[in-house]
């Protein structure tokens, strides 16, 4: 729980209203966390693993091998899981801001409990459990280059 408190403080500095929402979110047990072969936490919801149970960072790198941004584009990621693919984008495109859309608050809370968010900040803006019309009206969407995290997408079907 200490990591969760540290992450809340970090989130407060960049997105205070989201930090308050996360803090109020009750802990739910439908996100199960196991450890991958290489020692990283991986979330599972029902029968869906959100990352490789062996090498989630390698899976992220391989999955993004053909993802390319033009100089005027903003990377927009649909589905957070535990963010291995987001870190890959941040590493591949240093200095760029990444917009992450995660429709399920409980997944984000579990992410906050299990993953140090410091490497994501300040270049990541999290949009959590927000209706699509609000996302579109609140953000400049013209130059979005979307990446869909496929396991997260399967959850929303």
Q: PLM features: what roles do these ranges have?
A:
Residues 1-157:
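N-terminal donor/sugar-recognition subdomains of glycan-related enzymes
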């Amino acid at each position: 729980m200490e990591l969760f408190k540290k992450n809340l403080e970090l989130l407060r500095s960049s997105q205070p209203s989201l930090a308050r929402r996360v803090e109020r979110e009750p802990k739910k047990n439908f996100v199960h966390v196991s450890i991958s072969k290489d020692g990283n936490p991986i979330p599972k919801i029902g029968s869906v693993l959100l990352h490789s149970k062996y090498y989630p960072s390698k899976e992220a790198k391989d999955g993004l091998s053909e993802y390319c941004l033009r100089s005027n584009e903003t990377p927009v990621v649909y589905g957070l899981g535990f963010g291995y693919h987001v870190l890959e984008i941040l590493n591949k495109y240093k200095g760029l801001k990444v917009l992450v859309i995660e429709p399920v608050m409980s997944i984000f809370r579990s992410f906050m409990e299990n993953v140090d968010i410091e490497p994501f900040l300040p270049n990541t803006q999290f949009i959590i459990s927000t209706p699509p019309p609000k996302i579109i009206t609140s953000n400049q969407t013209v130059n979005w280059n979307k990446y869909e995290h496929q396991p997260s997408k399967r959850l929303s079907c």
